[in-house]
Amino acid sequence: VLKQYNPNVRLIYNGFDPELFYPQQIKTSRFIITYTGRLLSLAIRNPELLFAAIARLTEDKVIIPETFRVVWYTDQESRSIIRQEAERHGVQSFMDYHEYVPASDIPLILNKSSVLLSLTNKFDTSGPKGFMTTKFFESLAVEKPILCVQSDEAYLAEAIKETHSGLAATRVDEVYDFLKHYYEEWQEKGYTTSPVNRDKLSNYSRKEQASQFAHIFEEI
């Protein structure tokens, strides 16, 4: 938008520190979907597609609570919203809740996860699209499958598609197939990996961002 007023505007994305966030293959005894952050409004972040897909997977006897968990690291107010929605879809037995953890614990938590959850929603044309938080880029860095529900159909979806890092979903059947695929991979190997395009991924590293800043200053 700013380029309409000044053609010299440059966009440098937020990103991840590759010395802290990098992929590790850690076997786990359970399939774990992890979310870290707040959920203060379903209008901004909505897990409905995830919960509906889990309900279907349960009905089809694909998953059971003993081996399939959704782990939330969030605050009390957010947990209240999540519990209400999970109960409405009949999937509360799959939920685990934790308080926030120190930032130093996050890399290991992400690498022990089977799927990393990014919650968003589609906004109308007059509103903002796609909150691309640091958490999203850190999820990219560990090369675990990212599930974005509901797709913002904008910048988050584009980044996920460009990096081949997961799914920005708009339908329940997409989430169903995505989770079933990675649940079966976890059953076979004990962990999951995402076929990330590392050339595209490197564009979001702090090292690359520093290079972009340096290039801009050289042009001034």
Q: Model-found features: residue ranges?
A:
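A short, active-site helix/loop in glycosyltransferases that binds the activated sugar's phosphate group
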Residues: 1-8
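A conserved mid-protein helix/loop that constitutes part of the nucleotide-sugar donor-binding site
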Residues: 41-59
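Nucleotide-activated donor-binding/catalytic signature segment of Leloir-type glycosyltransferases, i.e.
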Residues: 67-74, 79-107
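Acidic donor-binding loop of glycosyltransferase active sites
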Residues: 110-129
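Short hydrophobic beta-strand element within catalytic cores of glycosyltransferases
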Residues: 115-118, 138-150
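A charged, aromatic-enriched C-terminal amphipathic alpha-helix characteristic of glycosyltransferases
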Residues: 170-174, 187-219
